[in-house]
Amino acid sequence: MKQDIHPNYQPVVFMDSTTGFKFLSGSTKGSSETVEWEDGNTYPLLRVEVTSDSHPFYTGRQKFTQADGRVDRFNKKYGLKDENANPDA
């Protein structure tokens, strides 16, 4: 392996800019901003827009939409009703 060609891998604190949630992880990305972590050490701080704390998929606020199939689109396009559909169900 060649010497001095690999990026510096270090512990970094990532902070969600929308919720303020922070977590410590390893990264090759650095920053001039620093923050003191719970263990008393100072680490570079990287601000990110979305984390598992704010993403709708992980928070349960995501809305699922049912995509219409080909038959449904055809029926909607030509104004046809499904006679087999049970409106009471």
Curated annotation (Swiss-Prot):
Signal peptide location: none
Entry keywords, A to Z: Ribonucleoprotein, Ribosomal protein
SUPFAM superfamilies xref list: L28p-like
Keyword Ribonucleoprotein set for record: yes
InterPro entries named among the record's database cross-references: Ribosomal_bL28/bL31-like_sf, Ribosomal_bL31, Ribosomal_bL31_B, Ribosomal_bL31_sf
Keyword field contains Metal-binding: no
GO-annotated biological processes: translation
Gene Ontology cellular component annotations, sorted alphabetically: ribonucleoprotein complex; ribosome
One Pfam family this sequence matches: Ribosomal_L31
GO MF annotation, one: structural constituent of ribosome
PANTHER family: 50S RIBOSOMAL PROTEIN L31, CHLOROPLASTIC, LARGE RIBOSOMAL SUBUNIT PROTEIN BL31C
Protein family membership: Belongs to the bacterial ribosomal protein bL31 family. Type B subfamily.
Self-association state and partner proteins as the record states: Part of the 50S ribosomal subunit.
HAMAP family in alphabetical order: Ribosomal_bL31_2
Protein name stated in the entry: Large ribosomal subunit protein bL31B
Source species taxonomy: Bacteria, Bacillati, Bacillota, Bacilli, Lactobacillales
Gene coding for it: rpmE2
